[in-house]
Amino acid sequence: MKNIVLARVDDRLIHTEILTLWVPEVRANRIIIVDDVVAKDKFRSKVIKEMAPQGLIIHVYGIDRATEKLKEAPSFDGERVIVIAESPLVFEELIKRGIKINQLNIGGMGIRGERKAVARRVACDAMEMEAIHELIKKHVHVYFQTVPTLSLIHI
């Protein structure tokens, strides 16, 4: 989808850095959060949507609905869309389903479970690292950058 101006992995999904730094940086007017669990949680979805400042629309979709929406090219004509998910596994699946993503920004991924630190504020488990390698094999430019004012770390 040509309208995706930022595809980002961030396990906090939406927070102040996204709204105050990334949205203005890429001039986004729409955010699509792709998360099956959050999409089913009506309360959490509502809270996330209500965080949107004027002029920004936030959607919370499970992966099936996100795939449908992102494939509907006319549905976001003229929009500048940020797509956010908690894991690179989600983006690997979106690409398998035919969604075109050229670049993937890996932002905050905290240490938990089997995750090990791989960069500042970024930790991955073996499956997530494998997904990153698969994305790179599919010619997706994957990089670490927590905020736009910091330099990119290319993978």
Each PLM stretch: what is its role?
Residues 1, 49-52, 133-136:
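Short, conserved catalytic or adaptor-binding loops enriched in Gly and charged residues
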Residues 4, 9, 13-17, 21, ...:
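Positively charged, polar, low-complexity stretches
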Residues 86-131:
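Long, charge-patterned amphipathic alpha-helical coiled-coil/hairpin "stalk" segments used as oligomerization
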Residues 147-151:
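A short, acidic, flexible beta-alpha connecting loop/helix-capping segment that sits on the rim
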Residues 108, 144-146:
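Short, structured patches in soluble enzyme cores that scaffold and shape functional sites
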Residues 153-155:
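Conserved small/polar residues in nucleotide/adenosyl-binding loops
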Residues 2-8, 115-118:
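Short, basic, glycine/proline-bearing loop/turn elements
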